[in-house]
């Protein structure tokens, strides 16, 4: 897959939605970041919000991929299959931390292997979290290095964004997210049977 073309197409798709996408990512960041700074209960609240909001972010960017006008409310659609999403979030993060405990590379591999879980749940909300995890792992078989490379391609853009007093980073985050959603769309065709 040509990652440069994927990134260019994502940037073109994002153009009419860039201000809204920046706002969605900003709201996501505030809802995840602010409670954890308050106190111990705030950290717990952040953990409880992280999975559903991550799913909402995936729903938002998948809408753009599918040519559907997104809205800020998409960010909160991840709360509908709440238990399913929370269990997926806990398992993904526990396994990633376990992998990172042993070495950096296993943690990265585990994270990449489960990286499509939220997209799968977004498109198949009836799917149980363990099925979505398994499906993501199978889907990413042979694609982890390519996805890692896609993430690395955004590193210079984030660094350039930092040069512009961090404001530029807020322009890169939606582009990065849409590129990952587009990557999911590209690889899912061979891996998920439509239900």
Could you describe each region identified by the protein language model?
Residues 1-31, 69-98, 110-162, 192-195:
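Interfacial aromatic "cap" segments that immediately flank transmembrane helices
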């Amino acid at each position: 897959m040509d990652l440069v073309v994927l990134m260019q197409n994502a940037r073109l798709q994002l153009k009419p939605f860039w201000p809204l996408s920046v706002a969605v990512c900003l709201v996501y960041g505030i809802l995840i970041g602010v409670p954890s700074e308050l106190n111990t209960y705030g950290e717990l609240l952040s953990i409880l919000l992280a999975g559903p909001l991550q799913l909402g972010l995936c729903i938002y960017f998948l809408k753009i991929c599918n040519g559907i006008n997104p809205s800020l409310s998409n960010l909160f659609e991840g709360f509908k299959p709440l238990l399913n999403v929370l269990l997926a979030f806990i398992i993904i993060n526990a396994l990633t931390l376990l992998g990172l405990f042993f070495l950096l590379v296993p943690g990265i591999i585990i994270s990449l292997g489960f990286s499509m879980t939220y997209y799968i749940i977004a498109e198949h909300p009836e799917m149980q979290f363990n099925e979505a995890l398994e499906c993501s792992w199978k889907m990413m078989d042979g694609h982890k290095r390519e996805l890692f490379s896609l993430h690395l391609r955004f590193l210079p853009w984030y660094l350039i964004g930092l040069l512009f007093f961090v404001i530029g980073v807020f322009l890169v985050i939606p582009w990065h997210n849409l590129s990952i959603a587009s990557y999911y769309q590209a690889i899912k065709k061979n891996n998920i049977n439509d239900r």
